[in-house]
Amino acid sequence: MSSLRQSEIKRKTNETDISVFINLDGNGISEIETGVPFLDHMLHQISSHGLFDLKIKAIGDTYIDDHHTNEDVGIALGKAFSKALGERKGISRFGHFFAPLDEALVQVTLDCSGRPHLSYDLQLKAPRIGNYDTELVKEFFIAFVNSSGITLHINQIRGSNSHHIVEACFKAFSRAMRMATEIDLRRSDSIPSSKGMLENQ
């Protein structure tokens, strides 16, 4: 198993130009600039609470709306996670966390299985948080799941303030990802699967 679990992804389309660097064994240091302020705020949560060092730079067609940038950042970040995990040797594989933020409580459970699936249950009453379309929260996670190959369940236990709910979601996600991607010393160099492999299908 490589001692450096980090990766860099560059993704350029006619709509966006994105670069992502991640170090899974970092200290929660981040430099993030996507042109979508609320998305930046949520990505900082992933870095800070997951203890992932994260650099993201995105230039997109936000003069139209934030959809392409939001989705493509999710794709690039998911690919970066998958690449940094490599064969996924020695990882804990499963992660879960309950995160509260005032009246909001969100549960995230995930499996770095190589089997992309999203179950998403956030009830966001506000159509926007600042200028950010709340429909884009689900779109971000769809993109991340499909490119990273994880199974992800997001459940809102309670909450009324949309900002609190979304931020609790990202905090729970970051802690669950931290748990799942950490090395289990008892596994050493083995892949945590009875099949002997975990691949992004």
Curated annotation (Swiss-Prot):
Location comes to: Cytoplasm
According to UniProt, the name of this protein is Imidazoleglycerol-phosphate dehydratase
* Entry annotated with the keyword Cytoplasm: yes
**Under which main EC class is this enzyme filed?**
lyase
Q: Which reaction does it catalyse?
A: D-erythro-1-(imidazol-4-yl)glycerol 3-phosphate = 3-(imidazol-4-yl)-2-oxopropyl phosphate + H2O
The record lists the organism as Prochlorococcus marinus (strain MIT 9215)
Q: Taxonomy-wise, where does this protein's organism fall, top ranks first?
A: Bacteria, Bacillati, Cyanobacteriota, Cyanophyceae, Synechococcales
PANTHER family, sorted: IMIDAZOLEGLYCEROL-PHOSPHATE DEHYDRATASE (PTHR23133:SF2), IMIDAZOLEGLYCEROL-PHOSPHATE DEHYDRATASE HIS7 (PTHR23133)
Pathway membership, UniProt: Amino-acid biosynthesis; L-histidine biosynthesis; L-histidine from 5-phospho-alpha-D-ribose 1-diphosphate: step 6/9
Q: Name one GO cellular component term.
A: cytoplasm
* A GO molecular-function annotation: imidazoleglycerol-phosphate dehydratase activity
HAMAP family per record: HisB
Identify the NCBIfam families for this entry: PRK00951.1-3 (NF002108), PRK00951.1-5 (NF002109), PRK00951.2-1 (NF002111), PRK00951.2-4 (NF002114)
Q: Which family does it belong to?
A: Belongs to the imidazoleglycerol-phosphate dehydratase family.
Keywords per UniProt: Amino-acid biosynthesis, Cytoplasm, Histidine biosynthesis, Lyase
Which Pfam families does the record cross-reference, listed alphabetically?
IGPD (PF00475)
